[in-house]
Design a protein with these regions (language model features):
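Extended repeat-based interaction scaffolds and adjacent low-complexity, acidic/S/T/P-biased segments
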Residues: 1-215
Length: 215
């Protein structure tokens, strides 16, 4: 039955919705005592389809839909990591890299995927800095850059605190941005930084006393 249902769709977004609860069954079982080996077979069959279809499903989405997918990607990443299947993990990592590099993916998704790849140590600081430089380029719309930051900084701002080269890129971007653009993105920046723990915010505030006073 599970396998029949899984073959009914190749929609990556629907597959992502299904993944976390199925992995939960593999870890803990359920009250229906579902056959976990059958669940594992289904999961191992549809994750490659998810990876193949992910980028195409996310092309040219608006901000509202992209934010919904952002949460799905974070959940799917956690679920795939729990499985401990190296081949599936490699396929997923490749899909994340495709998301980062595709020009028509929304900035919040590109930022989130960059962050995940950094945390997996698939992007080192240099590779991450390259993506950050591109996202925070003065040639880009300031709102798009701030939205990329929202995705990149999801969960924690510690990577900025512990990686001075990344902090420097943020510093330079805010220092160079015009006053009118800065005022426009203040709500986005506040929303992003408000999600950090009090200790993180205090540390970053100490580092940021200068940079949030643009010229």
């Amino acid at each position: 039955r599970l396998r029949e249902i899984s073959t009914l769709t190749n929609d990556a977004l629907h597959l992502m919705d299904s993944l976390p609860p199925l992995v939960q069954i593999l870890r803990y079982g359920n009250v229906r005592k579902t056959d976990t080996e059958q669940v594992r077979t289904v999961v191992e069959e549809f994750i490659p389809r998810l990876c193949i279809g992910l980028t195409a499903s996310c092309v040219s989405l608006d901000e509202e839909n992209s934010k919904g997918i952002f949460e799905k990607i974070v959940s799917a990443n956690h679920a795939i990591s729990i499985l401990g299947n190296a081949a599936l993990q490699t396929s997923w990592n490749t899909a994340l890299k495709q998301m980062v590099l595709h020009p028509a993916i929304h900035p919040i998704l590109k930022g989130a995927c960059t962050r995940i790849l950094f945390e997996k140590q698939l992007y080192d600081v240099k590779a991450t800095a390259t993506q950050m430089h591109y996202a925070l380029s003065m040639a880009n719309d300031a709102t798009e850059s701030a939205t990329w930051l929202e995705g990149f900084l999801h969960g924690s701002g510690l990577l900025l605190i512990h990686n001075p080269s990344l902090w420097k890129i943020l510093d330079e971007w805010v220092d160079e941005i015009s006053m009118s653009n800065f005022k426009e993105i203040i709500p986005l920046l506040r929303r992003t930084f408000a999600k950090f723990s009090p200790a993180e915010r205090e540390k970053m505030l100490q580092l940021a006393k200068r940079i949030f006073t643009p010229k």
